Amino acid sequence: MKIAHILRKYEPAQWGGTETAVLRLIQGLQTQGVSSAIHAPDSAASSENDPMCAAGVKVSRYHAFAPVWGISQRQRDELVSWGGNLFSFDLFAQLLQSPADVIHSHALNRIAGIGLRAARWKKIPHVVTLHGGALDIPAEVNEQLTAPLKGGFEWGKALGALVQSRRVLELTDAIFTCNPREAQLLQRKYPQQRVIVQPHSVPAAQYAVDHCDAALKAFPQIAGRDLIVKVARLDPAKNLPWLVRQLPEIKRRHPKAMLVLIGAGTTQHVVEELHREIGRLGLQNDVLLTGGLASGSPELIGLIQQARVFALSSTAEPFGIVILEAWAAGTAVISSRTSGPLALIDHGRTGLLYDVETPSTFHQAIDAVFNDAKLHQHLREEARAHVLAEYDVPSIAARVAKVYEDLRRPLARLSKADMNDSRSTTYAIP
């Protein structure tokens, strides 16, 4: 079986959670005898340091554009980097020539509409994975997504109508989401649709290998410091400037604390705000911005392992694949109460949750992990056991492969009752 995976954006230098999830899915599918190819927009970057290519995955590039007049190049770059509704004339022809048995869109809107139209033309199934959510998105995040459009004229509605982009979730053959709350909202809006809660995965054994020395060699400034680590692209929903603003109070209580932010700068105004806040607060020696590190690299794993705590401060986090990585690395996790972490974390057992609107709850969680050695050890041990049992790569990929196979049955479509029968293996929502 061959799968065509469609990405709205793929820049290895801006690697993030979506890319990690897709690569791990593809690697897991390989163990099930399923081959994959990636279809992604053009990139000026070299393929020499491309993790997909390094894993033996063919990456076919298509030309894509944002159909908007009257915006600056910076606004256009931000649209492409984070949430822009792109279109491509190349992608449809590329998919028609593909030998794929299933088309799997890891995007929504026009790009997913093109994938759906190609699948219907080829009479093969089409599925969508919602990596960033569709209905369970806070209003402030929606505002941030549309901010780059301000002052411009969006002329792509006719293109969207051509591929029925607004009906993708209604017309696709199955929707994967990693978020139970999102699944409930989708099932309510599309009661006849197959909505499948499909968690992401982590190669737990890889993250258990001790790489602390590699991290120390790459970043000697961390020696003797108590690290608070976060892995995230530098985009608005990750709420990183807020985290920086909490550091003076943390240092007042824990003088050796250092904040380590691992991730590529995908949104320029967020990068600028981070540097501005670090300078304003005099934290140049207490905040380490590593830039993007390769997924699964010794340096990345080592920094997570060196951390006293792994801290998420996101205002929107549909899943939180980095939580799985921290658990697998044996690091205690604290997180803001967004839908993904709320579904993942058992408060007090596998991590601690706090309210980002109430910073005192964040500091209470930090204090608990720093001061209570017994709790710290308990969180690490419980989370490590949990990730091994529930989120290792092969078992997750097997569930996706089964959905692909089910959709390829005669007539290529199951009834909803048929899908209900397989819910024990695919986590479909009642």
Where are these regions (language model features)?
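Conserved donor-binding/catalytic core segment of Leloir-type glycosyltransferases
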Residues: Q221-K238, V244-L247, V260
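Nucleotide-activated donor-binding/catalytic signature segment of Leloir-type glycosyltransferases, i.e.
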Residues: V271-A294
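A short, well-ordered alpha-helix in the C-terminal region of glycosyltransferases
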Residues: T361, A368, L375-E390, R399-A401
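A short helix/loop element that forms part of the nucleotide-sugar donor recognition site in Leloir-type
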Residues: A208-Q221, L274
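Short hydrophobic beta-strand element within catalytic cores of glycosyltransferases
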Residues: A332-S335
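Carbohydrate-associated surface elements
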Residues: R181, S201
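Conserved acidic donor-binding segment of nucleotide-sugar-dependent glycosyltransferases
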Residues: H347-G348, L352-P359, A368-K374
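Aromatic "clamp/platform" in nucleotide-sugar-dependent glycosyltransferases that forms part
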Residues: T315
